[in-house]
Regions:
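N-terminal [4Fe-4S]-dependent radical SAM core
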Residues: 2-16, 20-71, 116-117
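C-terminal scaffold of the Radical SAM
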Residues: 4, 59-70, 89-114, 118-405, ...
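Local cysteine-cluster metal-coordination motifs and their immediate loop/turn environment
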Residues: 74-89
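Structured DNA-binding interfaces in DNA transaction proteins
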Residues: 390, 412-413, 425-426
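Short amphipathic alpha-helical interaction segments
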Residues: 403-419
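A short, conserved structural fragment
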Residues: 419-429
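Minor-groove-contacting beta-hairpin "wing" of winged helix-turn-helix DNA-binding domains
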Residues: 430-434
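Short, amphipathic alpha-helical interaction segments positioned at domain boundaries
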Residues: 436-455
């Protein structure tokens, strides 16, 4: 269907392999480049299994760090590959859902001990199109989660359990099954309410079914819903984008994710662009759309809590906040990435390998990084700076000094530079981006991260 940081078709910023955030990781062409046109920075992996996840997990207890209280599950099946999507997904013509679920349940059992110190507080099921999984298989998956994990926080309503949904695959029966299994939040991929723009994106759903999907979720007792939109679609006007926002608001969801269209490598959308089939939206139009988003949603009571995410008070995506605040999470399914005890890993993104090459219930892994203080600090700056709450200056400077005493001095100097340029707020106890800074978030983060490099 569609962590951290990207143009997805969902509100979940799914972490990628090791340390690389999805958007804004590459060096921009100027000191404060707009995040609207940042290339994706992903390590060049051959995508073949290189490690046994069991060995990685067995090493984790040797390092300090909180146990994971969050879980990401990736379900790769789609009925059609959207042209802008670079997430691992397959159009399954061989009906591999059942063997996949058998394998997934085994993996969930294998990794459970690393989250067993307490209840799970958040679960996010992404894809792919999770709502395409057959209802009887959803029942099995939800039962397996309840058997292997403590879901008391989620059952009480204090925790969060999100499932991504395509509007065309939402049914009353499926929503009832999800709610009975503890799901209390759905993320509906609308992308646009204009049929011609959906056609450009190769999204196969009727725009009117977005409101229907949200209504069915509510009727089943799933109290929280999020709607995802994309702007900067070729041919899209500022007026059309504002109309999309107002239609989404009329549906009454408490959370919206609004992403600019990014031309990711190895996608059909990028291939079409290179063939000259369309012209990308001008950056000044994208900036106008970005400003319209903030203004329109703020007036409706949805505040920006992250560069591309807006919510009414208390409706923020708690699972996303785990990523952005540098927390720990378990991960299961092909291409899923996890972070526990300073270790980061990415499961194989090939379903055939996922089904056939795991050992002891664990998935084969294509990338792994062990604990690294400097890398962790860089990631915290990149992700936390995108939050409206910003960074605790004293904490980040203390940790920078542990990496290298002079690094803290350089980092503070870089932050003061951002303050002087009006990109970071004047409150020096927390480094928060201003409205102008949010437009240039990746560039500001790069300035701070570069300050950590040895001179």
């Amino acid at each position: 269907m569609h962590t951290p940081l990207q143009t997805p078709a969902t509100d979940a910023p799914r972490p990628h392999a090791a340390s690389t955030p999805r958007r804004g990781g590459a060096k921009p062409p100027r000191p404060y480049a707009s995040p609207l046109r940042q290339p994706t920075a992903i390590p060049a992996l051959d995508q073949r299994p290189v490690a046994d996840a069991g060995a990685i997990f067995r090493a984790i207890p040797a390092f300090p760090g909180p146990a994971a209280s969050s879980l990401y599950i990736h379900i790769p099946f789609c009925f059609h590959k959207c042209h802008y999507c670079d997430f691992y997904s397959i159009v399954d013509t061989r009906d591999r859902q059942e063997p996949f679920l058998d394998r997934l349940i085994g993996e969930l059992a294998a990794i459970a001990p690393w989250g067993a110190s307490g209840p799970l507080r958040t679960i996010f099921v992404g894809g792919g199109t999770p709502s395409l999984l057959r209802p009887e298989l959803w029942k099995r998956l939800l039962a397996a989660l309840a058997e292997r994990y403590d879901l008391s926080e989620i059952a009480s309503g204090r925790g969060e359990f999100t499932v991504e949904c395509n509007p065309e695959t939402v049914s009353p029966g499926l929503m009832d099954i999800l709610r009975a299994g503890g799901v209390n939040r759905v993320s509906v991929g609308a992308q646009s309410f204009e049929a011609r723009h959906l056609k450009t994106l190769e999204r196969w759903h009727d725009p009117e079914n977005v409101a229907r999907a949200v209504a069915l979720a509510r009727a089943a007792g799933i109290e929280r819903q999020s709607v995802d939109l994309i702007f900067g679609i070729p041919g899209q006007t500022a007026a059309e984008w504002e109309r999309d926002l107002r239609i989404a608001l009329s549906i009454g969801t408490g959370h919206m994710s609004c992403y600019d269209l990014t031309y990711e490598p190895n996608t059909a959308m990028t291939a079409r662009l290179r063939r000259g089939e369309f012209t990308p939206a001008p950056e000044d139009l994208e900036v106008e759309m970005f400003d319209t988003t903030v203004r329109t949603l703020r007036a409706a009571g949805l505040e920006r809590y992250e560069v591309s995410n807006f919510a009414r008070p208390g409706a923020e995506c708690r699972h996303n906040l785990v990523y952005w605040r540098g927390g720990s999470w378990l991960a299961a399914g092909p291409s899923a990435s996890g972070h526990v005890g300073g270790h980061r890993w990415k499961n194989t993104p090939r379903l055939d390998d996922y089904l056939s090459r795991g050992t002891g219930g664990f998935s084969p892994v294509v990338d792994h990084e062990g604990p690294d203080r400097r890398r962790d600090l860089v990631e915290r700056i990149m992700t936390a700076l995108r939050l409206a709450e910003g960074l605790d200056a004293a904490e980040i400077l203390r940790d920078a000094a542990l990496v290298e005493p002079a690094a803290a001095v350089r980092l503070r100097r870089a932050a003061l530079k951002g303050v002087g340029e009006g990109l970071i707020g004047a409150d020096l106890s927390r480094w928060r981006l201003t409205d102008a800074g949010f437009l240039l978030a990746d560039g500001v983060a790069l300035e701070l991260m570069t300050a950590l490099d040895p001179v």
